[in-house]
Amino acid sequence: MAQLVYLCFRDNTLSEPFSNLIDMKYDHQIKVSKPSFKLPEFEKVKQLIEICNELKRTYKKEPNGGSPQLFHLALEQLRVLNRIYENRTNWMTELLYQSGEQLYAIANKLDEIQNKLDGPEDTGDGDEEESYLIQAGRVMHMTLNICFKDRNERVDENRKIGVFYIGTLLFKLYNRIKAYGLLNNMCKVFESHFNEIGPYLSRINNDLIVIRFKFYMGLYYGYEKNNYALGFKWLQETFDICTLYESIPSTYKVRSQVLIYLIPMRILHLRHYPRLAPLRRTYPSVAKIYTMLVKSLCTGNLKLYEKFIEDNEFYLVKRNLYVTVLKMKELVELKLVKKAWILNGGNTKVPLDMLAKAFQISRGTPCHVTENVAPNHDQELDELECILATLISKNYIKGYLSHSHRVMMTSKTPFPGLAKPLER
């Protein structure tokens, strides 16, 4: 069995026996023997085999995966693999990913156990030990650096393909421990090196890796950099890959997760609103979240929009959707102005008093029958002018404001189409 592992180094190919060696759940240990050929890394490989054997023995005793000893063995397994990987080509990449996934699962399990012991009220005294996931992330980051630093000109051998494998593991890990600063920094690294590493993305034959990478890059561009075009691009590509597996019931949760973030990007970038009836049939959980928002956008109902924000504030903040959804308010206001303009007969001269009443009705606030009844009437009109000025400055409305006459002058066709075609 050991000879089959050694042959992987001679032939630069990954075989099933080597993968089985790394897998702690595969209950078969290997006896170390001398290789039948010269193997420069023999001492390191010997050490790796011994660690893997001990890892399997420990797991067999504690199959629930909640042992600190198991964690330290898995951590050392990845460290030794890193030392071997530094002098090898990318044939070992999936092996390191396998080891990293295994390490993540053990660390996550131990952190969950520790969190239950600490309790929700335990804030720590500043002397607590690092979490297992943080320790695991540090070693995974070493793997990532090994991948990034490869200067091999042969694309089929270069370790840079590994940045996507290990990078997605780190994305998942940072997201789990809510280290959003580290997650965003990682995305910045990928962004700055994408011309260099981009060609390797198409060479990955594991769609799960591609889905994870594109998803987190979509979140980074769309929700951190407010680049809705790139956010939409990455998330749409993620969803397109996910739909290839829609016949598999277990993928429904993943597709729903992607849609939750894709819909706001589609609205803000393309001005395309989801059709609620098909959405309710196919993704009822997603439709439940966005029905109120979509209705407010389509009708210009500010009261409904505010209710959506109020009812879902905690959820939106937790999912990092809050700021993005707030930016949709001007689209609700635009729809309301358009409806008021139509009710005004499409005249190019639109009194601000009339628009102010439309806003009051839409917000569900008392509507004053006569002008200047309310003591804050001028203030309301000033606030309305600010809203209209913003819409005009963004070319959502073709027109201008006359502050002295309290009117908005528009062109004959003041509302240019904002929807963009979907490019494939």
Curated annotation (Swiss-Prot):
Database matches in InterPro entries: Csn12-like, PCI_dom, WH-like_DNA-bd_sf
Give its localization: Cytoplasm; Nucleus
GO molecular function terms attached to this record: double-stranded DNA binding; RNA binding
Q: Name one GO cellular component term.
A: cytoplasm
Q: Which Pfam families match?
A: PCI
- Which Gene3D superfamilies does the annotation name? Winged helix-like DNA-binding domain superfamily/Winged helix DNA-binding domain (1.10.10.10)
Is-annotated flag, keyword S-adenosyl-L-methionine? no
Alphabetized UniProt keyword annotations: Cytoplasm, Nucleus, Signalosome
Q: Where is the PCI domain?
A: 224-415
Family per similarity comment: Belongs to the CSN12 family.
Self-association state and partner proteins as the record states:
Component of a COP9 signalosome-like (CSN) complex.
Q: What does this protein do?
A: Component of the COP9 signalosome (CSN) complex that acts as an regulator of the ubiquitin (Ubl) conjugation pathway by mediating the deneddylation of the cullin subunit of SCF-type E3 ubiquitin-protein ligase complexes. The CSN complex is involved in the regulation of the mating pheromone response.
Q: What is this protein called?
A: COP9 signalosome complex subunit 12
Record the organism: Kluyveromyces lactis (strain ATCC 8585 / CBS 2359 / DSM 70799 / NBRC 1267 / NRRL Y-1140 / WM37)
